[in-house]
Regions:
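A ubiquitous short alpha-helical element
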Residues: 7-12, 30-37, 55, 433, ...
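Long, highly charged low-complexity segments enriched in Glu/Asp and Lys/Arg with interspersed Ser/Thr
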Residues: 79-92, 670-672, 677-679, 720-741
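Short, mixed-charge aromatic SLiMs
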Residues: 46-52, 73, 553-567, 729-740
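Charged, amphipathic alpha-helical regulatory modules used
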Residues: 1-109, 728, 732-733
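Extended amphipathic alpha-helical segments enriched in small hydrophobics
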Residues: 528-537
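Conserved catalytic cores of very large enzyme subunits
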Residues: 91-95, 102-522, 539, 543, ...
């Protein structure tokens, strides 16, 4: 007689026949919709049969008992009930196996026994990293099994359409945001514990920039940016100047309070210090010179403080620094020029005792015709300083304010100038712009959520047939649309208290409490990204976009993306956009899945990574000008973000003119966002910076940091921070400048 049952975890419990009966009755009810006397009788008979099946006082496992239940049901005339029981049993087995697998993954993350460097900005060995990554795996599992539609889940699992940041899906977070610093610094803001007064000096303003970046980064999973920091900081440079001027005047007069109110007009004036006709400044030249000197000193210290804060204040799990970006370069007022100069000199100076290259913020110099690109332009000297910074620190990157894709911007409103959120994400024309506002305003808008279509998978499904591929791609783009709307609706369903800082302070444009958070989120973008165009072309025609035939097909593919996004934008009144995905981790994981299914295919899967979006493969021997020529034919199809970069060797640090030629060439070719990769190796013992391999040429140390660009951002030592695929990609990057500049 059966007396004990051994559970799956090894525990033994008393045999309970009622549990067998209940399981059998559930199977009958699932088929018949009710429990009949026949069902009750069969459940009783099978339970008695199992109890008496064993001799003496026996112990049976769960699996053995379930096998006997199946045998008993199959012996009846109700084979349909037997099938229902078997199906349910198999489903439960699959769920247990999934739970076992997720438990295994969580244990690996908690112990850091299988570090994969999915995010180069997260230290997976740290306490916070281990805890955060374990939590992320659980969140991803719940998103896939409980929240995503079956179609979206299948596309993700089958390496067709990747849903980004699954760990943030369930809680309904959005991706990234361009923060409206003009408003937050001038009006102050509230936090959960207190409220913050408006900035009263340039030092305070830069401190608050770091604070706001930190606070906003906790409301989302992506990057945060300032769209025109040079313009934003002008009033606070002036506030500091007025303070220092009055301090100087107090050394001359007993009381300066009578003149202070008369100077306040200058703070919000459109006329800068050099042109103001304020009589107090002209009549007190020594005080003026003192105030200007002290203001510049305060400004430099404030910028230095911001750089250090943004590289040390780790506010996310995993000891993660917020992904911060600052756009600047177009303000021609003296005060704005001082800000630009301080930002660039701070970048060149570096951070810490070894003056290391700042990882954050990502600096983005906004190139603008008539402002900073040519000799004689008012900010041309600052463009030269930006190039020097790029040669030494890789930052800044370069945004093209005159890009054709940003048509309609207001030359008098820097909020409408083209800017990016660092890696490449950008805000295009807002179809939901409020009446009377410019649809190109970037502040308070961001990318809500992205997906990425794995193009090589679709090419394999088409068996190399171009027409069939285009049909499959068209359906995949429609699927991507549906997945984005599905996630957008879920994000819009969240309580504003979930991101109280963002909604209470209006950091996201257009929030109206009576209409819910959709009123703000509708101004952001829904990005349809892509991965592996070069490999896709190889599958379809045996050539990539560096050939005329490859470029012709590439344009056809990108036109389909653009046309569909434009169509969806009008139909759904949501800002769908074509996105050239960074694919920091996806370039490797998508390739790994591809290889598992299709094996090694020459020029397609014979490496550990897919080529990002529409880029020329990194291993192609090509000049920087040719690379720009090729990619410039495709970047115009993207409205939600793209980047073009070239790879140069360390010798360019002594050839600023060559960098200027390249940047201007890219801008003239209508490249929206351009970056230059230059090796940046630092000895962490003596501080020497240059290009070297395993040992410092000065002190011989092997304590080396080899800094490389991972997407649009920089990160730490690529040999430890990047995943396997991205490491290989970095090592295969050819120098485009050899003999070409």
């Amino acid at each position: 007689m059966l007396t004990k049952v051994q559970k799956r975890d090894g525990r033994q419990v008393d045999f309970d026949a009622s549990k067998i009966k209940n399981a059998i009755l559930k199977a009958f009810k699932s088929v018949d919709g009710e429990i009949t006397p026949y069902a009750e009788q069969k459940a009783e008979n099978i339970a008695d049969y199992i109890e008496g099946y064993y001799e003496d006082e026996a112990t049976a496992t769960i699996e053995e008992i379930q096998d006997l239940v199946e045998k008993g049901l199959m012996s009846t005339r109700r084979k349909d009930v037997a099938r229902a029981y078997i199906t349910y049993r198999n489903q439960r087995t699959e769920e247990r196996e999934k739970n076992t697998e997720i438990f295994k993954i969580v244990k690996e993350k908690l112990s850091a026994s299988n570090v994969q460097n999915q995010n180069a900005n997260v230290d997976e060995h740290s306490f916070g990293g281990r805890k955060g990554e374990a939590s992320n795996e659980v969140n991803k599992y719940i998103a896939l099994t409980e929240y995503m539609s079956p179609r979206a889940r299948d596309n993700h699992i089958n390496n067709r359409i990747y849903t980004h940041d699954l760990d943030s899906y369930v809680v309904g977070m959005h991706n990234c945001l361009s923060v409206p610093f003009d408003i937050l610094l001038s009006d102050g803001f509230n936090t959960r514990q207190t409220d913050i007064r408006p900035a009263s000096s340039i030092n305070t303003a830069f401190q608050l920039v770091a604070v706001i970046f930190q606070l906003q980064s906790l409301q989302q999973f992506g990057g945060v940016s300032a769209t025109h920091l040079d313009w934003t900081m002008v009033p606070y440079v002036r506030k500091s100047f007025v303070k220092h001027f009055c301090d100087a005047m107090e050394w001359v007069y007993d009381d300066c309070m009578d003149i202070r109110p008369q100077m306040e007009f200058y703070i919000n004036s459109s006329i800068d210090l050099e042109k103001t006709d304020c009589p107090f400044y002209k009549e007190n030249k020594k005080a003026y010179n003192y105030a200007l000197k002290m203001t510049i000193k305060e400004l430099n210290q404030a910028v230095e403080g911001m750089y250090h804060n943004l590289n040390t204040l780790q506010s996310r799990s995993g000891n993660q620094l917020p992904f911060t970006s600052i756009n600047y370069g177009t303000c021609t007022l003296l005060e704005g020029r001082l800000v630009i100069k301080a930002l660039l000199e701070g970048s060149i100076k570096g951070v810490g005792k070894l003056h290391r290259t700042p990882i954050f913020p990502c600096g983005i110099f906004q190139c603008m015709k008539g402002v900073n690109r040519k000799p004689g332009d008012p900010n041309y000297d600052l463009f030269q300083l930006a190039l020097k910074s790029t040669s030494l620190r890789l930052y800044p990157n370069y945004a093209n304010v005159d890009w054709s894709g940003n048509a309609g911007y207001d030359i008098h409103d820097p909020r409408t100038y083209f800017s990016t959120m660092g890696c490449r994400t950008a805000n295009g024309f807002d179809i939901n712009a409020e009446p009377g506002t410019n649809p190109q305003i970037k502040d308070g808008r961001g990318n809500i959520c992205p997906v990425t279509i794995i193009l090589p998978t679709l090419a394999m499904e088409a068996n190399g047939d171009v027409d069939k591929f285009m049909e499959i791609l068209d359906k995949a783009i429609a699927d991507a649309r549906d997945q984005l709307i599905e996630r957008f609706d879920w994000i819009c369903a969240q309580d504003p208290k979930s991101a109280q800082f963002m909604y209470e302070n209006g950091t996201m444009l257009g929030y109206k409490p009576e209409e819910g958070i959709r009123s703000a989120l509708k101004h952001g973008t829904l990005a349809i990204g892509q991965l592996g165009l070069a490999e896709t072309l190889q599958i379809l025609i045996g050539k990539d976009q560096t050939s005329p035939e490859g470029m012709e097909l590439a344009k056809k593919i990108e036109q389909l993306f653009k046309d569909r996004c434009a169509e969806y934008k009008q139909k759904y009144k949501l800002n769908f956009g074509v996105y050239y995905t960074p694919a920091e981790n996806l370039c490797y994981t998508a390739m790994k899945k591809f290889k598992d299914k299709y094996g090694i295919i020459p020029n397609v899967s014979d490496r550990d990574f897919f080529t990002n979006s529409i880029h020329v493969p990194v291993y192609k021997e090509i000049s920087p000008f040719d690379k720009i020529d090729i990619e410039s034919q495709l970047t115009g199809y993207s409205s939600a973000g793209c980047i073009t970069y070239v790879e140069l060797d360390g010798g360019v640090k002594n050839n600023i003119a060559a960098l200027e030629t390249l940047v201007n060439y890219a801008m003239d070719k209508d490249i929206p966002y351009f970056a230059i990769n230059i090796p940046n190796d630092t000895c962490l013992d003596c501080g020497f910076t240059g290009e070297f391999n395993d040992h410092c040429p000065v002190c011989g140390s092997d304590n080396i940091q080899q800094l490389r660009r991972v997407t649009g951002y920089l990160t730490g030592n690529y040999k430890t921070a990047f995943n396997k695929g991205k490491q290989q990609e970095v090592e295969m990057r050819v120098k485009h400048g050899k003999g070409n500049i």
